[in-house]
């Protein structure tokens, strides 16, 4: 579904991404993990078209820059960290409703179906208690729950998520991953994660990054064993067993 070929990116003299290549198959749930500053979010920004890819990122075999943005947005939903910039007099449902924008007819209001989808998604993702509340009175975690619901409101084929669990408590963190698991039954997920236990438990493929490079990729059980992760993050670890495999839980 997504293919990246020889993707490089630099700002001034600094190389951010260094000749990255990989493929994500349709129906997979792929995590991107690595130390802070290794380029995970930048990589996701290229896939989501927030940054130019110069014929290095392909969706269903076609370079993404040649796909009309509105058409791309109908199939690819994005949840990014920078989304916390949502401000103003907006209410919770307004944020989630924005996920239906690619389907809205020009100069027309959102349809009754759009509003029904918003309520359904807010219920399914646990965001319904926020319905009717103004954004300016919400915490970072509450805003994150809305941005997650907004992404699901697009009903995408491909879901791109940049550290969606960071501001969530344990209850909502696990609820999100279970919802992603259900979505994964009919869609494709690429997710940046710092929580290795969640990566091991829920993702079937992993891409490991360090200093702008991909140093390993493949089935999660093969690339996320405790010894490898300990060397990557340079921290003590302990073993835990998940489906008869050893992983680094931290």
PLM regions: where:
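Conserved ABC ATPase signature
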Residues: 108-109, 134-138, 142
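ABC ATPase nucleotide-binding domains
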Residues: 226, 230-250
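Helix-to-loop junction immediately C-terminal to a conserved catalytic motif
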Residues: 48
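The feature captures the beta-strand-to-loop junction immediately N-terminal to the Walker
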Residues: 33-35
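Conserved ABC transporter NBD signature motif
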Residues: 55-65, 72
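Catalytic Walker B motif of ABC-type/P-loop ATPase nucleotide-binding domains
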Residues: 159-163
């Amino acid at each position: 579904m997504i293919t990246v070929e020889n993707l490089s990116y630099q700002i001034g003299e600094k190389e951010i991404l260094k000749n990255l290549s990989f493929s994500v198959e349709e129906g997979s749930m792929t995590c991107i993990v690595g130390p802070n500053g290794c380029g995970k979010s930048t990589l996701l920004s290229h896939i989501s078209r927030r940054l130019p890819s110069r014929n290095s990122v392909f969706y269903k075999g076609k370079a993404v820059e040649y796909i009309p943005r509105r058409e791309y947005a109908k199939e690819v939903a994005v949840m990014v960290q920078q989304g916390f910039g949502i401000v103003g007099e907006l209410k919770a449902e307004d944020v989630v409703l924005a996920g239906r924008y690619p389907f809205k007819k020009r100069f027309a209001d959102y349809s009754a179906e759009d509003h029904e989808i918003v309520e359904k998604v807010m219920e399914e993702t646990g965001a319904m208690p926020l319905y009717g509340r103004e954004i300016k009175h919400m915490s970072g975690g509450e805003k994150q729950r809305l941005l997650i619901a907004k992404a699901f409101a697009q009903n995408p084929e491909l879901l791109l998520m940049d550290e969606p669990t960071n501001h969530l408590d344990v209850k909502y963190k696990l609820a999100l991953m279970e919802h992603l698991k259900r979505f994964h039954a009919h869609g494709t997920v690429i997710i940046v994660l710092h929580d290795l236990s969640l990566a091991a438990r829920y993702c079937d493929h992993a891409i490991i990054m360090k200093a702008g490079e991909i140093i390993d990729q493949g089935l999660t059980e093969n690339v996320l064993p405790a010894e490898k992760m300990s060397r990557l993050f340079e921290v003590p670890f302990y073993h835990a067993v998940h489906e008869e495999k050893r992983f680094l839980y931290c």
